[in-house]
């Protein structure tokens, strides 16, 4: 019975966090080096939803994490899945960076 109550409380908290707007108390300056407005400090006030807050946080990052890069891998031209590389016998090609252009 106690486990069901804990599960119910967690589910209600998750649903309420997703549906209700997030309130950011006060404001905080965010410095952005590569912003379109010249990198001026921007004041983050009350946001209308949690999605807006997460977008602002992602805009202030200086790097792209590896998980974001993994999800956008280009497909092979023939549509077949990629085979794992054999690091001992993978050969030399333009893709591996050791290929020499002799033309």
UniProtKB/Swiss-Prot annotation:
Lineage, highest ranks first: Eukaryota, Viridiplantae, Streptophyta, Embryophyta, Tracheophyta
Biological processes, Gene Ontology terms: calcium-mediated signaling; cell-cell signaling; regulation of growth
InterPro entries: RALF
Family to which this protein belongs: Belongs to the plant rapid alkalinization factor (RALF) family.
Domain of life: Eukaryota
Site note Required for proteolytic cleavage, residues: 55-56
Stretch forming the signal peptide: 1-32
UniProt keyword terms in alphabetical order: Disulfide bond, Hormone, Secreted, Signal
Subcellular location field: Secreted
Keyword Cell membrane: no
Record function comment: Cell signaling peptide that may regulate plant stress, growth, and development. Mediates a rapid alkalinization of extracellular space by mediating a transient increase in the cytoplasmic Ca(2+) concentration leading to a calcium-dependent signaling events through a cell surface receptor and a concomitant activation of some intracellular mitogen-activated protein kinases.
Gene Ontology cellular component terms for the protein in this record: apoplast
Pfam families: RALF (PF05498)
Protein name in the entry: Protein RALF-like 18
Disulphides: 92-98
GO MF terms, alphabetically ordered: hormone activity
Propeptide residues, chain positions: 33-58
Chief place where the protein resides: secreted
Post-translational modification: Proteolytically cleaved, probably by S1P, a subtilisin-like serine protease (subtilase).
